[in-house]
Structure formats: structure tokens, C-alpha cells
Regions:
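Conserved HGGG/HGGXW glycine-rich cap/lid loop of the alpha/beta-hydrolase fold
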Residues: 5-50
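Active-site loop/oxyanion-hole signature of alpha/beta-hydrolase fold enzymes
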Residues: 41-78
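Conserved serine/cysteine hydrolase catalytic core
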Residues: 172-210
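Catalytic histidine-centered segment of alpha/beta-hydrolase-like enzymes
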Residues: 223-235
Length: 257
């Protein structure tokens, strides 16, 4: 893995888990608005690191834990996970011994997919991600609701370093067809599972609610997948800071009543 940080180590730490097909620096626009108050840690999965070999989800978590220990991070103010980053983040949450203040899932990819289906998906995912590199971001609109120039570099960098073997290994132990983990109730009360009302991932919301009924489930009315994070990183960062500091969602006009 590769790690980038923003802010002073003396400040409360915020750990980001990134979406599929992008590097960890994709959270940079948000981190820049938090760095005055927080120590932001942006790992890039081994899958998108040149010359590195993806071993397993457990190994990814081990690398994150080792990095946090090396940075003398003994607690996390917040964990933020976008899209498929939710899969790795959930595994991290069930294993880490670090105290965590709040967790925010952005359009979490909580699919439970059979092994055979995941195996068949791999070549299509590989071509989709590599095409973003080959076309310099030109194919982004075919796989995402937007093709903003501001986010293309993260896809291009990820596609450049991606190998088929690493992606196959990642998909083999991600989005597994297992019961969704139920986290401790005390932790659930500090978790936010956000979905846009028009995004495809909205379909996972009910299953997550059944597993973690004490969590918070804000719906961003009229928003697509990760739209608030992409289009308004400052507003998104301010929302995260509000949650961390006030233990509740700010009053945003687009949150479904």
C-alpha cells in the first residue's frame, strides 16, 4: 500500500478507505478542508500500487494497522469509507482494537456476491478500469454518472498500475456472499450509512439496516453515487467535521425527512 497524509499528527486522526478504480488520493479534495483540524490518512490499496502484490483483505488491514502504529495513532476520530471501500472498512472495524469515534460510509458497496459470479465479473472490471487509463479518462461517463475532469486523474493513475492478477485476488475475497456483520451496538450508534436516493447502491440500505439497526441512515434526496463528496468536497468535509464534533448530522436541505 501507499499512504498519503494531510495535517498535523498531533490532531485527531481520520482514516479514509477509497472507492474502486481510484487511488487513495481521490479523497484529497476532502482532506484538504479537514487538514487544519485533523490528521487525514489516505491509503491506496495494494491493487493500485505499482510493483506491489495483493495478498488478501487481511493483509491490507495488517498494513493499515502497522502504518497507524508507526504514526503513533492510538485512536481514530473518524473512519470514512467510499463505495467498495466500505467492504475493507467493515473488515477493519470488526478486527481493530483502536477506539473509533465515528464512521461514515458513502454509498457503501455492500453487495453479497457468489464466488462464481465474482470470478466472471473480474475481466469486465479489469477492462473498465484499464480503459480509463488507456483513454485518459475518456470512458468515465460509461461507468459513472459524471465525467468531471477533477476526478479523472485518480482513475487514470489507478488504471495505469492495475494488473489483472491483483484485481482477481482482490475480488476473490471482497463482496463475499456471507451474512452482513453486525457491529457492537455502542459502535452502531456512531455509524452513518449514507446513500443517494437515485444511486444504484441504495438497494443495499435495507439489508444493512437489518444488520445494524442502531446506526444512522441519512438519504441524500436526488443525489447519485458519491455525488456530494465529488461535487462539493468542502461541504462534505464540513459535514464530517460536524458529525465528529457534535455527534450528529448537520441540517442539510437535501436530507430526506
Amino acid at each position: 500500500m501507499l499512504f498519503q497524509t494531510y495535517g498535523d499528527k498531533k490532531n485527531p486522526a481520520v482514516l479514509f478507505f477509497h472507492a474502486m478504480g481510484v487511488t487513495g488520493v481521490s479523497s484529497e479534495p476532502v482532506a484538504k478542508y479537514l487538514q487544519d483540524r485533523y490528521f487525514c490518512i489516505l491509503p491506496t490499496s495494494t491493487v493500485y500500487c505499482k510493483g506491489q502484490k495483493y495478498v488478501s483483505k487481511a493483509d491490507e488491514i495488517r498494513q493499515v494497522e502497522n502504518y497507524l502504529h508507526g504514526q503513533n495513532v492510538n485512536c481514530l476520530a473518524m473512519v470514512v469509507a467510499s463505495s467498495i471501500g466500505a467492504d475493507l472498512a467493515m473488515a477493519f472495524l470488526t478486527q481493530t482494537k483502536l477506539p473509533i469515534g465515528h464512521i461514515f460510509f458513502v454509498g457503501g458497496q455492500f453487495a453479497q456476491i457468489g464466488k462464481g459470479t465474482r470470478r466472471m465479473m473480474t475481466p469486465f472490471l479489469y477492462l473498465a478500469i484499464k480503459s480509463l487509463y488507456w483513454s485518459k479518462g475518456g470512458t468515465l461517463k460509461k461507468i459513472l454518472w459524471c465525467d468531471d475532469d477533477s476526478i479523472k486523474p485518480y482513475f487514470i493513475a489507478a488504471g495505469e498500475n492495475l494488473t489483472y492478477t491483483n484485481l482477481r485476488r482482490q475480488i476473490s475475497d471482497s463482496l463475499e456472499d456471507n451474512p452482513f456483520p453486525s457491529l457492537p451496538e455502542e459502535l452502531q450508534r456512531h455509524i452513518y450509512f449514507e446513500f443517494g436516493s437515485i444511486e444504484d447502491h441504495f438497494k443495499y440500505r435495507q439489508a444493512v439496516k437489518e444488520a445494524d439497526p442502531s446506526g444512522h441512515y441519512p438519504v441524500f434526496e436526488g443525489y447519485d453515487h458519491m455525488q456530494y463528496q465529488i461535487r462539493d468536497p468542502k461541504g462534505f468535509a464540513e459535514m464530517l467535521a460536524y458529525i465528529a464534533e457534535h455527534d450528529g448530522m448537520p441540517k442539510l436541505l437535501f436530507i430526506r425527512k
